[in-house]
Regions:
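Beta-rich interaction/scaffold domains
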Residues: 25-88
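Post-signal peptide N-terminal segment of mature Sec-exported envelope proteins
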Residues: 12-32
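Active-site-proximal alpha-helix that buttresses catalytic centers in soluble enzyme cores
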Residues: 79, 83-309
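Short, conserved catalytic or interaction motifs in soluble domains
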Residues: 6
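C-terminal motif of bacterial Sec signal peptides marking the signal peptidase cleavage site
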Residues: 2-3
Length: 309
């Protein structure tokens, strides 16, 4: 009887061991599949476009689509995570990459850093491009992003191809554009604006005329007290909008209730960081005593979150 019992126990143990082994094998397979996709995502999470970029974007999405829901949750790499393909950022079909040919002789190239959030891209970047097109009916408006990482993300996830700077300028040359205006959507004369200008300089001789517009805040100025009409316009519009959205009749009314408005920038180590201090000077010049300019990364120091608070 004991022997029979032992055989039954052994069989039960063997079955449990077999199931455990199968479970471990399945888990390992899931992890390997997820790691493969993570590697493919990390391969396109780069700032340089190569001859293999289009192929890599396609491969990454196809591999993601083959994963089970459980496997997708395991995707994790240096930059890869489940949100890269899995997060819903809106309907990409509502966007217009503005990468068409048939440009004509006059082109306005709107250059943005870019965003992979579809709803934001449609409302903000496309909104600016559409407004520029409406105001300049005799000019063709095209788009370029400076962030290849974002271009790759949108292409891989949504199959929407957006030109980088070189692609957009080469397209302009190929289409026989004579007069080119480059309109950045950048905030100020930072590193992105410098790189933009350097890229345009390489193509300067390909056109009869090339003009690069100022960023939103205009020229930088020599010190923190120097302001300009661009900064004034931005300060007035931002403050008016913020006061209205906060439900106050005026900035003074908000002040009486002890309410302050803080406009946050990213912050930068670039020499253009003085622009943040200049915007604070502009707010002060306008008499906006309860309006402050802050920076997330704390450069310049006088606009760091701690200083503002």
């Amino acid at each position: 009887v004991t022997g029979c019992g032992s055989n039954a126990d052994d069989a039960k143990n063997d079955t449990q061991a077999s199931k455990a082994s199968e479970s471990e094998t399945s888990a390992n397979a899931d992890q390997e599949a997820a790691m493969h996709v993570a590697d493919l995502i990390d391969a396109i999470y780069v700032q340089e476009r190569t001859d293999d970029t289009d192929k890599q974007c396609k491969e990454a999405k196809e591999a993601w689509d083959k994963l089970t829901d459980a496997q997708k949750e395991l995707v994790e790499g240096e930059n890869a995570d489940p949100d890269y393909f899995g997060r819903d950022t809106g309907d990409a079909s509502k966007d217009d990459p503005r990468n068409q040919d048939d440009i004509g002789e006059n082109e306005i190239l709107v250059v943005s850093f870019g965003t992979s959030f579809n709803d934001s891209r449609v409302a903000d970047i496309k909104g600016v491009e559409d407004a520029i097109a409406a105001a300049n009916p005799d000019w063709s408006v095209r788009r370029a992003f400076t962030a290849q990482i974002i271009i790759n993300h949108v292409q891989a996830r949504d199959d929407e191809k957006i030109d980088n700077m070189d692609q957009a300028l080469e397209r302009a040359v190929k289409n026989g554009v004579k007069n080119l205006v480059v309109q950045p959507t950048h905030l100020m004369h930072g590193a992105e604006y410098d790189e933009l200008s350097e890229t345009v300089e390489k193509y300067k001789d390909k056109f009869e005329s090339v003009k690069i517009a100022e960023p939103l805040l205009g020229e930088v100025g020599s010190d923190a007290t120097v302001v300009n009409e661009d900064k004034k316009a931005v300060a007035e519009i931002l403050t008016e909008e913020a006061v209205e959205k906060a439900g106050y009749d005026s900035l003074d009314a908000a002040k009486e209730e002890g309410t302050a408005f803080v406009f946050m920038g990213h912050g930068t180590s670039h020499t253009a960081k003085i622009s943040y201090s200049q915007m604070q000077s502009q707010m002060t010049d306008l008499g906006y005593e309860n309006v402050f300019i802050g920076t997330v990364e704390g450069e310049p120091e006088d606009t760091s979150c701690e200083s503002v608070i």
